[in-house]
Amino acid sequence: MFYCRSGFEKECAGEIQDKATQLEVFGFPRLKNNTGYVLFECYQEGDADRLIREIKFNELIFARQMFAVAVEVSDLPKDDRISPILDALSEVEDVPCCGDIRIETPDTNEAKELLKFCRKFTVPMRQALRGKKMLTERDSNRIPVLHICFIAPGHCYVGYSYTNNNSQFFMGIPRLKFPADAPSRSTLKLEEAFHVFIPKEEWDDRLASGMWGVDLGACPGGWTYQLVKRSMFVHAIDNGMMAQSLMDTGQVKHHMVDGFKFEPPRKNVTWLICDMVEKPARVAHLMGEWLIKGWAKEALFNLKLPMKGRYDEVLQDIENLKDFLKKNGFQYKLQAKHLYHDREEITVHIQAISNISPH
């Protein structure tokens, strides 16, 4: 089972089908539009476990979470939902003992009604599973996570994921609060990207105070805000106006020029960030140009998606960018994700591994 943004089931299914085919795991996706999840039916027993081990979760773009389904339980009675779930699990072999439980729903308006129930249900369900030795006495992040996903009040899928190859977040969504002093809600996209792409233990080194960043298409400053908050200095590139609150910090230099023409005055930039409303192929190429010239060490940018053929467009743009970097002898780590705060766009992160002198 794979969670995704409602309305992007087709893209998620296409991606899973591609990954499964590469691994020679045969099956087919089952999906309904606007449900917020995709099921992949494997033809062979044990292949679901193979998929969640061998598909690298951090290489999936459209899936927020993945787990192997052990059982589907429907028609749960209102007065006792626990016993049928325990009975169904007891009949299945190969379900590992788990160290944590997440009782979730897909991220849709309809399913949100179920979340209150999920929260109340978690404590008694956890106790019952511990009583049956299906869950460890204490939470452990070293062994699998048990997922119970309710798609309707009496209907759930129960399964497990591996902690070294899943999303650490409940429902695959980081819970972030909008900062009251941020100039726009877009600030949450960049904050979420930091949580998803950069391990927390590396934040002090890679998001350090005193670094320089460049924000292409910065106005009014939602993304710049995240760098300023971390005590960085920022070249904000936009013909529009920046929020006065950011300018007052003394950490922002505003350049009223075209983002495609700007060149940093000093080549001491660590972070290049970009959320421009432009053709995705054009933005991807611009990011590649900056990186091969050594103008930035890390790039984080959004690619806007077309109305049709979204998955194909994403694949093409990322493939072209990889080819461009490879041809120029540039070594890198690349991740892309359709984040919770993204809508018709995906976010891409590239970290330079090559040590290139700026030129």
From Swiss-Prot:
The active site is at K304. The keyword Cytoplasm applies. It is an enzyme of class 2 (transferase). GO terms for biological process: methylation; rRNA processing. Its EC number is 2.1.1.186. Gene3D superfamilies: 3.30.2300.20, 3.30.70.2810, Vaccinia Virus protein VP39. GO terms for molecular function: S-adenosylmethionine-dependent methyltransferase activity. Catalyzes the 2'-O-methylation at nucleotide C2498 in 23S rRNA. This is Ribosomal RNA large subunit methyltransferase M.
